[in-house]
From Swiss-Prot:
Function, in words: Forms part of the ribosomal stalk, playing a central role in the interaction of the ribosome with GTP-bound translation factors.
Protein's UniProt name: Large ribosomal subunit protein uL10
Tree of life domain: Bacteria
Organism: Gloeobacter violaceus (strain ATCC 29082 / PCC 7421)
GO biological process: translation
Subunit structure: Part of the ribosomal stalk of the 50S ribosomal subunit. The N-terminus interacts with L11 and the large rRNA to form the base of the stalk. The C-terminus forms an elongated spine to which L12 dimers bind in a sequential fashion forming a multimeric L10(L12)X complex.
Length: 192
């Protein structure tokens, strides 16, 4: 078997992983021993993730013409790819614990559903409530909206009526004040 079929098989494996993933984190694994990388793979598997060491060119070929093509700027130097789907928060914590213990890896970035993100961006995404909770909150907000609009519409005639009632009363007060002012001006002239 030549090199080309092996590379094509590796690209195919990477594409299958990408299809099943919603996030790919890219780390620099320079300086890690085989035992340390194996430990990271085991930890990632426990949280539904997959750790793969692959050549950047093969990952570039696997992501070409897909939503994952934004990973290209991260493909430099020795790269390990952490693929994940549902348990992003746990995967990120697992990686951060591993990085703190070994002090040998560097987080380059990640792609989440086709969007390139930094470590801070990934942490923000990981802190979001689950998709189901967000959908329930959105549905609740939509359900309340018509009620608020109806209450607002009902308030308009009331506010207009109050405003209309205030105009004559306000006008009467102004006219009364003008009458008193005129009387006060005429009294000093009459006294003089």
């Amino acid at each position: 078997m030549g090199k080309r079929p092996v590379k094509e098989a590796l690209v195919g494996d990477l594409q299958k992983l990408l299809e099943k993933s919603s996030v790919v984190m890219v780390i620099d694994y320079r300086g890690l021993s085989v035992a340390e990388i194996t430990g990271l793979r085991r930890r990632m598997r426990e949280h539904g993730g997959t750790c793969v060491v692959a050549k950047n060119t093969l990952m570039g070929v696997a992501t070409r013409e897909t939503a994952w093509r934004n990973i290209d700027p991260l493909l430099a130097g020795p790269s390990a790819f952490l693929f994940g789907n549902e348990k992003l928060k746990e995967m990120l914590k697992t990686y951060e614990d591993f990085a703190r213990e070994t002090k040998k890896t560097e987080f380059r970035g990640a792609v989440v559903d086709g969007t390139l993100v930094t470590l801070d961006g990934l942490k923000a995404i990981a802190d979001l409530p689950p998709k189901e909770v967000l959908l329930a909150q959105f549905a609740g907000a939509l359900k309340v909206l018509p009620t608020k609009i109806a209450v607002g519409i009902n308030q308009v005639p009331t506010k207009v009526a109050v405003g209309i009632n205030e105009v004559p009363a306000g006008l009467a007060r102004v006219l009364e004040a003008l009458r008193k002012q005129k009387e006060e001006q005429q009294q000093p002239q009459a006294a003089a």
